[in-house]
């Protein structure tokens, strides 16, 4: 079973600004969500990579791709994507907190409980 949003973030809460996305990016995010929900992580990753090519600085795309990479067991890339998302998520505290939550999960998977605790603290500070 996939964990949806990080704890403390309502499911889909980080994607509340969907309406602001371009049509193709929004369509790819929707497709990726359906693929991920159906257990097709490779398909979801592929859809999100396409969305990233269209909107390389959209933190929602980076968040979702980090989430999929984490579910695929690629914690190092998940952390990298979430950190990149943070650089573009200024002024969006819920999204920033969600990205920090993903970083915490990624660090835990990489055997870094101290780094995970720091990321969780950062998520709390952000909100």
Where are these regions (language model features)?
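Alpha-helical segment of the N-proximal tetratricopeptide repeat
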Residues: 18-46
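Canonical positions in the second alpha-helix
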Residues: 51, 84-85, 89, 122-123
């Amino acid at each position: 079973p996939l964990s949806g949003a990080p704890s403390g973030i309502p499911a889909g809460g980080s994607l509340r600004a969907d309406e602001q996305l371009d049509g193709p990016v929004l369509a790819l995010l929707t497709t990726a969500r359906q693929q991920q929900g159906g257990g097709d992580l490779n398909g979801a990753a592929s859809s999100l990579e396409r969305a990233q090519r269209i909107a390389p600085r959209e933190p929602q795309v980076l968040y979702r791709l980090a989430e999929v990479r984490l579910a695929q067991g690629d914690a190092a890339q998940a952390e990298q994507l979430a950190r990149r998302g943070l650089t573009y998520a200024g002024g969006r505290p819920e999204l920033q907190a969600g990205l920090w939550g993903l970083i915490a999960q990624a660090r835990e998977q990489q055997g870094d409980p101290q780094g995970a605790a720091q990321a969780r603290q950062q998520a709390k500070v952000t909100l």
